[in-house]
């Protein structure tokens, strides 16, 4: 169904955020990354950036690619992660609502065509990106277990992902 594809199909799929290289981003004319936090960069119950995340962030910075965390997480969670590393962020973003996607674009100073959203959820990250008309990358969740608030979204996502698999629109496994 076209509506499912329009709303929930990401531009790209990767296994993890580390697979998103500056070379890939530059090849797609991307100058800024908006990324989810929980289960995209770190597990939802992991408070701090680990060495792999910090290395990835430095790789983006060294390539002049801007970064902003766009998270539905509360301010203390997101600020506690982002501020020690000088990362711009928007917490309590209410994704897939559009307002904070637009705010993120303003904070980054980039156009939609040069910005990409990275996230692990179709129902929030990808739907929001598609609604605001920016490219998106769906990553496999860092941790199989999610917070309680994500449970229903994951059940709906399974149905949508099965549809995408049946139509050969995705290539990686659950």
Predicted region positions:
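Asp-based, Mg2+/Mn2+-dependent phosphohydrolase catalytic module
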Residues: 2-35, 42, 46-47, 52-117, ...
């Amino acid at each position: 169904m076209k509506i499912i594809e329009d709303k929930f199909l990401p531009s790209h799929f990767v296994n993890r955020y580390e697979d998103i290289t500056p070379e890939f981003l530059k090849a797609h004319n991307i100058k800024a990354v908006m990324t989810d936090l929980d289960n995209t960069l770190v597990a939802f119950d992991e408070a701090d950036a680990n060495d792999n995340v910090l290395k990835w962030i430095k790789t983006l910075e060294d390539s002049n690619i801007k970064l902003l965390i766009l998270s539905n997480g509360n301010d203390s969670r997101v600020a506690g992660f982002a501020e020690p590393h000088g990362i711009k962020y928007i917490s309590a973003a209410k994704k897939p609502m559009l307002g904070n996607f637009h705010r993120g674009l303003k904070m980054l100073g980039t156009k939609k065509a040069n910005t990409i959203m990275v996230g692990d959820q179709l129902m929030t990250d990808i739907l929001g990106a598609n609604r605001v008309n920016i490219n998106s990358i769906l990553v496999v969740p860092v941790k199989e277990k999610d917070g309680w608030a994500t449970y229903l979204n994951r059940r709906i996502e399974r149905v949508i992902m099965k549809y995408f698999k049946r139509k050969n629109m995705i290539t990686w496994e659950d």
